[in-house]
A protein has these predicted regions:
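Surface-exposed molecular-recognition determinants
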Residues: 2-188
Length: 188
């Protein structure tokens, strides 16, 4: 392929179903108490967050990832989780809470340099006629003692989502090299 054809092919407009990178955050030395994406535009139908995360929590091999939309910390959220670690299955629910417990992530008690991975889909984030929902898949491998979890969340608000804030459930900081990437998904 000639260089001109390659440039032409790579410069096409996004098609329905394509994911476009909106923003990324990589936590620097010293960690970060939170990560927030702000001023999210309305060019997409759905959002997706892909993250690899580790926190400073030392009380267990995992920590939780919390999500709040548009700065709302009132009891307008609900969430569900099912998962397991290869030996034990679990199911959890939270209703009328101030955040969505969105994922299990690695903690400082997990093996050295181990990060949890999660993919979170925020559906119809700009639709002002319905509450906002998300679904997620998360996992941690800890030398054979891993954890896998599927979850969903609800924000009982019809406002378009313009910001997403991530914090820890038990820890106080995301560790250096934790990485969050926000994508927008086009639709027809």
């Amino acid at each position: 392929m000639s260089p001109i054809l390659g440039i032409w092919a790579s410069s096409r407009a996004a098609a329905a179903g394509d994911y476009e990178s909106i923003a990324t955050v990589t936590v620097g030395s010293g960690g970060a108490a939170n990560v927030e994406f702000t001023s999210i535009g309305t060019d997409w139908t759905h959002l997706q967050v892909r993250a690899i995360v580790r926190t400073n929590y030392t009380g267990a091999n995992s920590d939780g990832l919390k999500i709040n939309f548009n700065g709302d910390t009132a009891n307008n959220y609900a969430w569900h989780q099912v998962g397991g670690n290869g030996a034990t299955a679990f199911a959890q629910v939270g209703s009328t809470t101030g955040t969505i417990y969105a994922a299990y992530i690695a903690s400082n008690s997990t093996g050295s340099n181990t990060f949890g991975a999660t993919i979170i889909d925020v559906l119809d984030y700009r639709n002002t006629n319905k509450y906002k929902t998300l679904r997620n898949l998360t996992g941690i491998d800890n030398n054979g003692n891993g954890l896998l979890m599927l979850g969903s969340g609800l924000w009982q608000n019809t406002n378009a989502i313009t910001s997403i804030k991530f914090t820890q459930w038990d820890g106080t900081s995301f560790n250096q090299h934790s990485h969050f990437a926000l994508y927008g998904c086009k639709s027809a």
